[in-house]
Amino acid sequence: MNKELKLFGDVLYISNAEYIYNDLHSIQKDDGLSDVIDLLDEDLLQIKYLNGSIVDVGWYPSFDESGYFKVMSIRRDDWENPIYSSTLGFNLNQLLEEIKIAISKI
């Protein structure tokens, strides 16, 4: 069964997800960094799959306007060696694309 993931006005359908934690749901594509900086922390999105794999998104350092998004795909709880990892500044269109790539790696 697919689970629905709402991001920046778009909807992605995630198959084989055990659960989805989505703290990005209230951010819209036209929001600026200063509009949402109080929402940006290390725990923004986590998709846990039935096979134990994880897609994880956070903002580092939390609540810091000079920070960056980090997107990772993790297998077998090996956080030290992600199968995919990307960092990027505040660009929500690019973030959506990076999340799609991370999902495709699982």
What are these regions (language model features)?
Residues 18, 24-26, 65, 74, ...:
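Short linear sequence elements within intrinsically disordered, low-complexity coil regions
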